[in-house]
Amino acid sequence: MEEFVRQCFNPMIVELAEKAMKEYGEDRKIETNKFAAICTHLEVCFMYSDFHFINEQGESIIVELDDPNALLKHRFEIIEGRDRTMAWTVVNSICNTTGAEKPKFLPDLYDYKENRFIEIGVTRREVHIYYLEKANKIKSEKTHIHIFSFTGEEMATKADYTLDEESRARIKTRLFTIRQEMASRGLWDSFVSPKEAKKQLKKDLKSQGQCAGSPTKVSRRTSPALRILEPMWMDSNPTATLRASFLKCPKK
C-alpha cells in the first residue's frame, strides 16, 4: 500500500501526509491504510479549492487559464495540511477578520464567499452514516459538512453542495479512479476492512514493501492549491505565512 500511495499521489501530498502522521506519532509503514486515507483526504481538499476565486466585484468565479492581469482572491482558505499550531493561527486570523465563530475542532477549509468553515469527509462506507458521525462530533451548525464516497455519492449540510457540478464531478472521478487502482492491485478490500488490512500488512512485511502489480500512471502536475500551501508549510514564521488577500491567479 505504501508503494501504491507514492505512485498514485503527488509527492507534495505524500510529504504533507507523512508530516501529519509524524506529528501524531503514527507510523506510515505500519498504518498504511491511514497513510492512504490521509493522502486521499488532502487531495480532495486541494481539488475542492482549485480554480475557485473571488473577483474584485466579490463574485465567485472559476479560472483555469492563466490570466496575468487578473487580481483574484482565493475563495477557499486551506487549513488542512498544516501543522496544528499554524492551522489554529490561520483559523484565529479568519475569525478575527470575518467575525466567524471559532470552531471547536480544526476544520478543513474556509469559504470566503459563504463565510463559513467547511469540514470535508471522504468515506469508504455509507455517506449518511459518516455524515452523522461528523455532525455528532462537531455539534455546530456553523461548520458546513460535505461528504464524498468512493462510489460517487455525496452528502452535504442542507443539501448545499457549495461547488458547481463539474468541480464535484472531478473529485468523484478521482476517488473512483483511486478505488479502481487499489482494486486492480488487490488493495481495496484491506482498505475497507480492518480484518483484511491485517492480512495485507502481513503480506507487505513478507514482501518487504515490494508493490504488487505494475506501476500506477500518475500525473505529476502540481495542484494550484499545493503551490500556495508549499511555502506556508516550510516557513516557520506564522506572520509570514498569512498571505495577502489578493493574489494573481497561479499558473496552471
Swiss-Prot record:
InterPro entries: PA/PA-X, PA/PA-X_sf
Record has Protein biosynthesis as a keyword: no
Compartments in which it is found: Host cytoplasm; Host nucleus
Site note Important for efficient shutoff activity and nuclear localization, residues: 195, 198-199
Residue numbers marked as site, Important for efficient shutoff activity: 202-203, 206
Pfam families: Flu_PA (PF00603)
Keyword Acyltransferase carried by entry: no
Biological processes per GO annotation: viral RNA genome replication; viral translational frameshifting
Catalytic residues identified in the record: 80, 108
A GO MF term: RNA binding
Domain of life the protein comes from: Viruses
Keywords from the named record: Decay of host mRNAs by virus, Eukaryotic host gene expression shutoff by virus, Host cytoplasm, Host gene expression shutoff by virus, Host mRNA suppression by virus, Host nucleus, Host-virus interaction
Function, as annotated: Plays a major role in the shutoff of the host protein expression by cleaving mRNAs probably via an endonuclease activity. This host shutoff allows the virus to escape from the host antiviral response. Hijacks host RNA splicing machinery to selectively target host RNAs containing introns for destruction. This may explain the preferential degradation of RNAs that have undergone co- or post-transcriptional processing.
Family, as annotated: Belongs to the influenza viruses PA-X family.
Domain comment (free text): The probable endonuclease active site in the N-terminus and the basic amino acid cluster in the C-terminus are important for the shutoff activity. The C-terminus acts as a nuclear localization signal. The C-terminus is recruited to host protein complexes involved in nuclear Pol II RNA processing.
Protein name, entry field: Protein PA-X
Lineage per the UniProt record: Viruses, Riboviria, Orthornavirae, Negarnaviricota, Polyploviricotina
Gene name for this UniProt entry: PA
